[in-house]
């Protein structure tokens, strides 16, 4: 016997597990574009409010994961309450465990690959079920819910989770480009940036039914015309409100986006030559952001698990009573503008401050602990991921050998050794830089938007690279040639 394998536990449920079939033939470039765009649009249009919630004026339990939502496409009190987190986390965690040989799986065998994909899907669905019921019984959706209400909320959130999982699988199975979850997440982050700047949705922010626009620019315009604020007061509010997007955070987010865009072009070019034809020289680029945004995603995945576990203990067990022994040890949640559940010390050590000045004056230690956590986890992940994801120095050296390529001035047997001097350093340095940008942005009070824009920009560039390669290989007959006016298009 080969022993127990974790992937084997999904075998009994394979007949009832929903699955997207592989396409019968390779899809044309234009079809993949359509599938990719519509997958993102369908997810965006799925942000329906939950049905069956008590019509309370003010929720008793506010949002404990407000600073994590922007990274995983989560929308509070909608069908997308937990967004893409279960899908992204299940893929990252299980692939990491498989690469570290914690999970026994042979990716060279098709049946093992299929079982692993099914395990990833089941793990994501189970997370949707667990998260839904944690929030239900913690009182996030209201107190004293009836059995019908509990069942209805479960049906909506778990059903939406299964739908989201299958929607991402459509892209993963070859109907679109790259990773389905990453593509959808990139679309959501881009949309959120527009909504945070120009959103007209009115959100209640006070006890007296006072509302403000979600978009920072729209809020400025309304503030200048408001009867409840002076001209100067409207401008100040537009730049410094800490419970909804403001112009200061919008400017910082755009600055971070520009920096990440620039970092995408930073690379080391290694001179290479062909071993099959003389005089054929070129360069092999190794990007600074070698592992992309995955290091930041991993750090925030671990943060999500930590804060959900803390939420269970503080809210579900201790009922958020400051006098309870659990709250004395872990801290409790404080209400911020009837929207956010802000953790207190010591849980606040692993949560970014809601504003820079509040962080400096009330929780200065957070800058050290939060930054250290993001940096250490990101660097550790990048170092492990580059070694197990098929892009290590040894893997690249094997690709060179298969393609008849070698480093200029180096023997073929020394290629892996030379690449090993560059690739791990690039992966770790890139992860360090992205983590540092993230913690600086979050320390300024961006509430997850810094991490979100880092993930969105890096994910967008990865998608663009995949589309570009696909277009060069099979996009010659694409209808986009005619639209873009490419010379020689039919």
From Swiss-Prot:
**Residue ranges, Lumenal side:** 54-121, 168-174, 264-293, 361, 443-449
Bilayer topology reads: Multi-pass membrane protein
* Any GO molecular function: signal sequence binding
Annotated PROSITE patterns = SECY_1 (PS00755)
Q: Which UniProt keywords apply?
A: Endoplasmic reticulum, Membrane, Protein transport, Translocation, Transmembrane, Transmembrane helix, Transport
Give the signal peptide, or none.
none
Cell compartments where the protein resides: Endoplasmic reticulum membrane
Q: Respond yes or no to whether keyword Endoplasmic reticulum is given for this record.
A: yes
Keyword Phosphoprotein in the entry? The reply is: no
User: What Gene Ontology cellular component terms go with this record?
Assistant: endoplasmic reticulum; endoplasmic reticulum membrane; Sec61 translocon complex; Ssh1 translocon complex
Q: Which GO terms describe its biological process?
A: post-translational protein targeting to membrane, translocation; SRP-dependent cotranslational protein targeting to membrane; SRP-dependent cotranslational protein targeting to membrane, translocation
User: Which Pfam families does this UniProt record tie to the protein?
Assistant: Plug_translocon, SecY
Q: Where are its TM segments located?
A: 33-53, 122-142, 147-167, 175-195, 243-263, 294-314, 340-360, 362-382, 422-442, 450-470
Q: What is the purpose of this protein?
A: Part of the Ssh1 complex, which probably is the major component of a channel-forming translocon complex that may function exclusively in the cotranslational pathway of protein endoplasmic reticulum (ER) import.
Q: How does it assemble?
A: Component of the heterotrimeric Ssh1 complex, which is composed of SSH1, SBH2 and SSS1.
Similarity comment:
Belongs to the SecY/SEC61-alpha family.
What name does UniProt use for this protein? Sec sixty-one protein homolog
Species of provenance? Saccharomyces cerevisiae (strain ATCC 204508 / S288c) (Baker's yeast)
Q: Which gene encodes it?
A: SSH1
